[in-house]
Regions:
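N-terminal amphipathic/basic-hydrophobic helices that include classical n-h-c signal peptides
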Residues: 1-31
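Charged, low-complexity intrinsically disordered segments
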Residues: 19, 23, 29-216
Length: 216
């Protein structure tokens, strides 16, 4: 299973330039009236109910209750393959993303990748100094820039989780979105993969996956 996962990583990365172009084209042609909408978790409940009176409003953040909490990148599913690192797995998507970061004063952090608490996963510039890039695998020598890391590390990792750990949640969202509007609440709402100014919304990735428009 570990070797199979590693091959899947390599196949996905080799297709990356084509996938980026494909995503950009399909994103431009995305249907205008989507039944899944992403909104800010910071909006007041009454504001959301007024804007979407007949919608099913769902929290998909790490603070959610029930099964939808598993859609959070912070959730410790365990056994998630670490990109470009055959035979090694981590607890969460966020743990991989943060753990592979390198800084002026710190290299990668395996403890962050093993963290199952959903807390203390963030690695900050204030503590570790200027960022140098994401290491391309635990034992890699190459450092990836922010957007490249987003495409080659974050997106494939989160997709693996959706396909291997969250199919029940995805099936539920697809069924409900066929009947009525579904609003997903996230703390971030940026769905532009190529915009480095804001963190990427995982709720937007869930929406894309449900609609068959996932970037990779």
């Amino acid at each position: 299973m570990q070797a199979k996962s590693s091959r899947l990583w390599e196949d996905t990365v080799n297709l990356m330039p084509h996938l980026r172009q494909k995503w950009q084209l399909s994103n431009q042609n995305e249907r205008k009236k989507s039944m899944i909408i992403v909104e800010s978790h910071r909006k007041k409940p009454e504001t959301l109910r007024k804007a979407y009176p007949d919608a099913l409003i769902l929290d998909v953040t790490s603070h959610a209750t029930g099964a939808l909490r598993k859609l959070s990148p912070f959730y410790p599913h365990m056994g998630i393959p670490i990109p470009f690192t055959p035979g090694m797995t981590a607890a969460s998507v966020e743990g991989i993303w943060q753990g592979l970061k390198t800084f002026e004063k710190a290299d990668i952090d395996l403890d962050v990748m093993r963290n199952t608490t959903m807390k203390d996963l963030k690695r900050t510039v204030r503590r570790f100094g200027a960022p140098k890039g994401h290491r391309k695998g635990v034992h890699g020598t190459e450092l990836l820039g922010y957007l490249t890391a987003r495409w080659e590390i974050y997106l494939p990792t989160y997709k693996w989780v959706l396909e291997n750990k969250c199919q029940m949640q995805i099936d539920l969202l697809r069924r409900e979105s066929e009947k009525r509007t579904v609003v997903l609440l996230d703390y971030e709402i940026n769905g532009d993969i190529n915009d480095p100014r804001k963190p990427l919304s995982h709720a937007q990735l869930v929406k894309m996956y449900c609609e068959g428009n996932y970037p990779v």
